[in-house]
């Protein structure tokens, strides 16, 4: 069974074709600048790159180009589209309705549109991608896999905000959490590396990238996470502020005369590492300037980031009543050995001892603590695409088995 995994942004489309017999990636690629000048498809097979530069006016054209690349005589990996058994779509927000992946039908599409008000930047492009695939592959099953689904196991006291309860009942204002597919994958991988069943373990997963969140995983289930109603909450991120005093918003409105749109733009696009450093949202740039140029604001931005991560880890140790393992993943979590060392240096009360040599290993799942470390620390490259493909395969096979009965 071959599964096409698709992740649509407002002007981009990432994809992987995975053979589920051995979970091998046959091809992967990225369509950029959809509907914008300079559109480009980068298609990769066995490390070789094939680039198509031509106008791509919308996502339907992008999907068509991807499928043409997959069946191309020179760069393709399948004979025709019938070899694609199903398409798995990443969908950011499933609201309260979806606690698991689901086969997409008309009812599901209506629900996804309803959820768009909760994720106006993310769900609409996801829906556009689904519609584009359905138009070109009308007989191929489509599956939605939700970023929010893993966090459906949070207890109510963890996700309810201390606001009038009617706001939750009428408008769904509550903590939802995001990056769930990533937190799920790396927590399961950590259990595998430890040689233990995940049902025996308490794990804190740190998805640290341009967007960042931390999750408390108790015996395989998310019981708390620090992103909230939107992905703006929690840690300081690349351009997002994370948790701040909500009274700052009316202050900026009343004292400075900023509009809500202006404030939203500042909090989402001009804050975080970029806002504090005044240099870049890219952690690598800020680390380099802090290290080699001794830039104080760059160092301050890093210190705030490290502090917030340590603070949430400490909070989740309390929530879990102990911890067996901490996992770092995503761009910063996987690649910043300095960042991991700084964060873990404040966690000595957990009996963590970092092995400096192991901490410098990149590109593979690795334990970076010494043999006598009481709490294990892992660096695990995330693989959300594989989780989406696995969930898609499971649902399609389940549907086939029901039909055969």
UniProtKB/Swiss-Prot annotation:
Presence of the UniProt keyword Disulfide bond in the record: no
Q: What is its EC number?
A: 2.7.2.1
Its protein name is Acetate kinase
Instruction: Kindly state which keywords UniProt assigns to this record, in alphabetical order.
Output: ATP-binding, Cytoplasm, Kinase, Magnesium, Metal-binding, Nucleotide-binding, Transferase
Under SUPFAM superfamilies, the record lists:
Actin-like ATPase domain
Instruction: Give the reactions, separated by semicolons, that this protein catalyses.
Output: acetate + ATP = acetyl phosphate + ADP
- Which cofactors, if any, are listed as required? Mg(2+); Mn(2+)
Q: What does this protein do?
A: Catalyzes the formation of acetyl phosphate from acetate and ATP. Can also catalyze the reverse reaction.
Compartments annotated for it: namely:
Cytoplasm
- Record-level GO BP terms: acetate metabolic process; acetyl-CoA biosynthetic process
Q: Which organism is it from?
A: Clostridium kluyveri (strain ATCC 8527 / DSM 555 / NBRC 12016 / NCIMB 10680 / K1)
Binding-site residues for substrate, renumbered to this chain:
90
**A GO cellular component entry from the record:** cytoplasm
Against InterPro entries, the record matches this protein to: Ac/propionate_kinase, Aliphatic_acid_kin_short-chain, Aliphatic_acid_kinase_CS, ATPase_NBD
Q: Name one Pfam family in it.
A: Acetate_kinase
How is the co-factor bound, per the entry?
Answer: Mg(2+). Can also accept Mn(2+).
Q: Where is the active site?
A: 147
Quote the record's binding site residues for Mg(2+). Answer: 7, 384
What does the sequence similarity comment in the record state about its family? Belongs to the acetokinase family.
Main location (coarse class): cytoplasm
GO-annotated molecular function:
acetate kinase activity; ATP binding; magnesium ion binding
